[in-house]
Amino acid sequence: MSGWIITAAAVLLIGVAVLFLLSVTARVPGNLRVRDGRLAPCPASPNCVCSQADDSEHWIAPLTVNGDVGGAMARLRTVVLETPRTVVTEETAVYLRVEFRSAIFRFVDDAEFWLEPEIRRIHLRSCSRAGHSDLGVNRQRAEWIRRAFTLVDRPASRSPAGSFGDATGDVPTAAETH
């Protein structure tokens, strides 16, 4: 019985060591950024989603900008940074790249967001650096970001008071108050 426990513990320890090694040796992919109007394609593995993917396994809808286009990336940045263990690694007026780290093994997922202001759309790509499957984490996170962005990305609302006309008739003049 004790031989079985020692073997199981050794296998578990080796597995943890391999996962840790994968985590610390994974490098930033060289194909990130927008090239010719497109984010990098997803690899064949299921650990990636992209709004510009050509296949349904990897495709995810882009974000729609409903509010001010000029402030869209700042609003998105605020939403993205609500995610734990997130670091912004690159940022321009129309592009945001972040790294998400997992809690236990510190695996890194690279995410990119690219604003096309003329069509009020933010394309996104999120992909794990290491491993094959992410158990749907990139898709779930991207959908959470979409929901949160939709909540903060509202057009500036107009006050309903503007539809009632000039309110000066309701204010008594100096002669009426004396």
Predicted feature locations:
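Ser/Thr-rich, low-complexity intrinsically disordered terminal regions
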Residues: 4-8, 18-178
